[in-house]
């Protein structure tokens, strides 16, 4: 199969998982616990561009110990899901937006951009050989797709590499919340920041996530599930929650208003975030993208003005927030249960992804 100037070759796994093995894994897939039988690999070399597009058996890769990615972290990645609909078709949600964001991240890390058409074709190629790994319709299970690009050129000089590799791997993913949506408690980090103006916060870059691990551990030590990030300059303004964007609901019912931090260059432009903003507008809610500081959050939560808070991202879709710890203080969001607006938006978004709600924005695309 060709995509632009690239032709994909397929080398099938000699010993793929048996039907019984795969079905056992799909019953309790977890997240990132199992992987499909194959992966996509595409090479890049300066002067030649992207080439050698292949579907190959999933397995270890060979990398020179001095590969630039191992020393200077020159890599970017994406995350999206493939869903099986009731008619048997396999679809993706806004994969074109993931392709565009991967290019944007690559530009920020001085990595060659992978053309959108090649990105989309890589998804189709992997689904074609591993379609049996996509969980059945009707539940919240899906096949998680992880595309990433990393510098493979050996060398210890601090400079952009001239050789790269694109890989696409896939992992069946179970429902994020078992037994119902579980609100989380969050720890507001005042010592650490996720990103700063002019930095890499808007890129989906592994270094951002590595730098968040210490603060996440601090949150756990303080009895919280997730960390909330403040801005790097004033340490006042809410930016993100863990690796997710965050929303505040003011008021209730049809007059509810949604507020989310504006994209300042230090926030990841989440695809779920963008989708929820559109769905909120469709539902008749007022939406604002603006700065909101920790004092406003605490005061308006205490006054009952902020009635719901949730974070959003590919893995969990929407995660409600029940309790907030900030230094020595602690406060709750309303009654600590998932709110009406939160659940309505979640139901609409997951309904579109599952094919049970109308896709009025043309977000779903067939992969197989």
Swiss-Prot record:
Belongs to the class-IV pyridoxal-phosphate-dependent aminotransferase family. Homodimer. The gene is ilvE. GO terms for molecular function: branched-chain-amino-acid transaminase activity; L-isoleucine-2-oxoglutarate transaminase activity; L-leucine-2-oxoglutarate transaminase activity; L-valine-2-oxoglutarate transaminase activity; pyridoxal phosphate binding. Gene3D superfamilies: 3.30.470.10, D-amino Acid Aminotransferase, subunit A, domain 2. Inhibited by ammonium sulfate at millimolar concentrations and by O-benzylhydroxylamine (Obe). It comes from Mycobacterium tuberculosis (strain ATCC 25618 / H37Rv). Catalyzes the reversible transfers of an amino group from glutamate to the alpha-ketoacid of the respective amino acid in the final step in the biosynthesis of branchedchain amino acids. The amino acids can be ranked in the following order with respect to their efficiency as amino donor: Leu > Ile > Val. It comes from the Bacteria. NCBIfam families: ilvE_II, PRK13357.1. InterPro entries: Aminotrans_IV, Aminotrans_IV_CS, Aminotransferase-like, B_amino_transII, BCAT-like_C, BCAT-like_N, BCAT_family. Its cofactor is pyridoxal 5'-phosphate. The modification N6-(pyridoxal phosphate)lysine is found at residue 204. It catalyses: L-leucine + 2-oxoglutarate = 4-methyl-2-oxopentanoate + L-glutamate; L-isoleucine + 2-oxoglutarate = (S)-3-methyl-2-oxopentanoate + L-glutamate; L-valine + 2-oxoglutarate = 3-methyl-2-oxobutanoate + L-glutamate. GO terms for biological process: branched-chain amino acid biosynthetic process; branched-chain amino acid metabolic process; isoleucine biosynthetic process; L-leucine biosynthetic process; L-methionine salvage; L-valine biosynthetic process; protein-pyridoxal-5-phosphate linkage via peptidyl-N6-pyridoxal phosphate-L-lysine. Signal peptide: none annotated. The keyword Translocase does not apply. Keywords: Amino-acid biosynthesis, Aminotransferase, Branched-chain amino acid biosynthesis, Pyridoxal phosphate, Transferase. Coiled coil: none annotated. This is Branched-chain-amino-acid aminotransferase. Pyridoxal 5'-phosphate binds at residues 101, 209, 271-272, 314.
